Amino acid sequence: MHTDDPVLDLMDRFTAALNSHDLDAVAALVTDDIVFESTSPPPDGTRYEGRDAVRRIWAEMLTTTPQARFSVEEQFSAGSGRAVVRWRYDWADGHVRGVDIVRVRNGQLAESLAYVKG
C-alpha cells in the first residue's frame, strides 16, 4: 500500500477489489458520476458514465472471465488527484498490457481512461 499517497492507496484498494471480484467494494471506491472509458472496441473504446453503469461493465467482465487478474506493473501520482497506472490483465488463455489515466475526487475514483498495447 502507498499510505503516503492517498491516490495510489485508492488505486491499490481498487485493484484488490477487482481481483477479489468484490463489486460492492469497487462501487464504494468510485464517485456517483464516474466516467470510465474501456479499451474496446477499438479504436476508441466505450464510455460508461455513472456508478451503476461502471458496476455493470465490471460485473460482466468478471463473470465472463472469472479467473482473470490485474497486476500493477507501475503506478505514479501525477499531482492534483491524478495518477497513471500501468497494468497487465491476465486471463486463462492470454493477457494484455495497458495504462489507465485516472482522476480522484474526494477520495474516490472519478475518472478512468484505459488504453492498451496492440
Where does each model-flagged region fall?
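C-terminal and inter-domain tail/linker signature
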Residues: M1-G118
